[in-house]
From Swiss-Prot:
It comes from Brassica campestris. InterPro entries: NADH_UbQ/plastoQ_OxRdtase_su6 (IPR001457), Nuo/plastoQ_OxRdtase_6_NuoJ (IPR042106). The gene is ND6. Belongs to the complex I subunit 6 family. This is NADH-ubiquinone oxidoreductase chain 6. It is found in: Mitochondrion membrane. It is a multi-pass membrane protein.
Length: 205
């Protein structure tokens, strides 16, 4: 059941990537593919790959979306006009996503839902069960954010520079718009550029 729920939207979204006429839609359709694929990896027990898969690929989608919008000259006003048209579809997709989340999660992890009464406090304590076993994700997170935090921040700065470079490269400057060079305007001496014009007083006869 869970396999079909996760795999079916991934297949449909993968087909819509190739069939979408709007380039913006073809860029956005891989997001459900990566989301459902990370869910399948989570079911297989590969928690680290399930976490890193959407982070890396959705970041790449954000950069490609930036390139598509800036290189194809898509008007933002046209995108805003179509937002209301896709609100029902996005609402249905959001409800399906939340239904999947509540279907997968166990009731014991949600304290508001009715669960079985906790009777472990009435029994004797088994200390062997108190020993905590670290998962792969917890171990990598502990090492990454504790001992290798600097190496975690350096790639983020490199990606920031790459994104700024992409914006600068795809930015089109037109000659019709009047612009001012702020540095030259501040460097000009006003006493040499502004001339005082004196006029003779009018004489009335």
């Amino acid at each position: 059941m869970i396999l079909s729920v996760l795999s079916s939207p991934a297949l449909v979204s993968g087909l819509m990537v190739a069939r979408a006429k709007n380039p913006v839609h073809s860029v956005l359709f891989p997001i459900p593919v990566f989301r459902d694929t990370s869910g399948l990896l989570l079911l297989l027990g590969l928690d680290f790959f399930a976490m890193i898969f959407p982070v890396v690929h959705i970041g790449a989608i954000a950069v490609s979306f930036l390139f598509v919008v800036m290189m194809f000259h898509i008007q933002i006003a046209e995108i805003h006009e179509e937002v209301l048209r896709y609100l029902p579809v996005s609402g249905i997709i959001g409800l399906i996503f939340w239904w999947e989340m509540f279907f997968i999660l166990d009731n014991e992890s949600i304290p508001l839902l009715p669960t079985q009464r906790n009777t472990t406090s009435l029994r004797y304590t088994v200390y062997a069960g108190k020993v905590r076993s670290w998962t792969n994700l917890e171990t990598l997170g502990n090492l990454l954010y504790t001992y290798y935090s600097v190496w975690f921040l350096v790639p983020s700065l490199i990606l920031l520079v790459a994104m700024i470079g992409a914006i600068v490269l795809t930015m089109h400057r037109t000659t019709k718009v009047k612009r001012q060079d702020v540095f030259r305007r501040n460097a000009i001496d006003f006493r040499r550029t502004i001339m005082r014009r004196t006029t003779d007083p009018l004489t009335i006869y």
